[in-house]
Design a protein with these regions (language model features):
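P-loop NTP-binding core
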Residues: 1-252
Length: 252
């Protein structure tokens, strides 16, 4: 049975989707069977793996709201499988609000396919509302991207409070799978200080690999290609491949 890992941080612009996309591609290249479930209405993870949002037959919205089997919505790509998102998902919170077990809809959708994958990443929206709560209830662990910049730790206390609440009341198996340091600038002492602070806050949970600031990471999504393929030797690509090695080792 594979693991479900929610990639979550309620702050935007921390490298959440970039991490989800590139770790999916890098782990797939290592021979793992990986699914990226795009649970963000912006659907950037969907397009980041080369899936044309205009041409998908079903999305995660149809799976969670209309009970379409997840298998019917999954799109296979050269970089891993994708359970695509769409703008319709933005209205899912309103549609689910009066539903029984509204926080369990994603869990119900993913359970039938969980055993077919080594790893399922869930790319969460940058907020702590019902969609993210669904992801936390469905997951075995969370991966938290934290940018090595000012205010990096701001808001993480809210995330940790939510994590503790979900673990206590809804999903006792939920753990911190790992913390990924992103947007690291080795030219500044500040990035190093933030990295040290994050490691102090999450002892034993922070990946050794840090993801540097890298122009190729910003360019790759516009081509619908993971940076691990777009520019295999770039610093961003090398970092995500090394982080994928760390994740694979944790799964064994």
């Amino acid at each position: 049975m594979g693991k479900i890992i929610a990639v979550v941080n309620q702050k935007g612009g921390v490298g959440k989707t970039t991490s989800a996309v590139n770790l999916t591609a890098a782990l797939s290249a290592l021979g793992l069977k990986v699914l990226l479930c795009d649970f963000d209405p912006q659907a950037n993870a969907t397009s980041g793996l080369g899936v044309d949002k205009r041409k998908i037959k079903h999305s995660i919205y149809d799976v969670t709201i209309n009970d379409i089997p997840a298998e019917e919505a999954i799109v296979s790509t050269k970089y891993g499988d994708v359970l695509p998102s769409s703008a319709d998902l933005a209205g899912a919170t309103v549609e689910l609000i009066n539903s029984q077990h509204r926080e369990r809809q994603l869990e119900k959708a993913l359970q039938p396919i969980k055993g077919k994958y080594d790893l399922i990443f869930v790319d969460c929206p940058p907020s702590l509302e019902l969609l993210t709560l669904n992801a936390l209830c469905a997951s075995d662990g969370i991966l938290i991207p934290v940018q090595c910049e000012y205010y990096a730790l701001e808001g993480l206390s809210d995330l940790m409070n939510t994590l503790r609440m979900v673990k206590r009341k809804m999903n006792p198996r939920l753990e911190i799978f790992g913390v990924a340091l992103t947007m690291f600038d080795g030219r500044t002492n500040f990035s190093t200080q933030v990295a040290q602070e994050v490691r102090k806050h999450f002892p034993g949970k922070v990946f050794t690999t840090v993801v540097p600031r890298n122009i190729r990471l910003a360019e790759a999504p516009s081509h619908g290609i993971p940076v691990t393929v777009y520019d295999r030797t770039s610093r961003g690509s090398v970092a995500y491949k090394q982080m994928a090695d760390e994740i694979k080792a944790k799964l064994i």
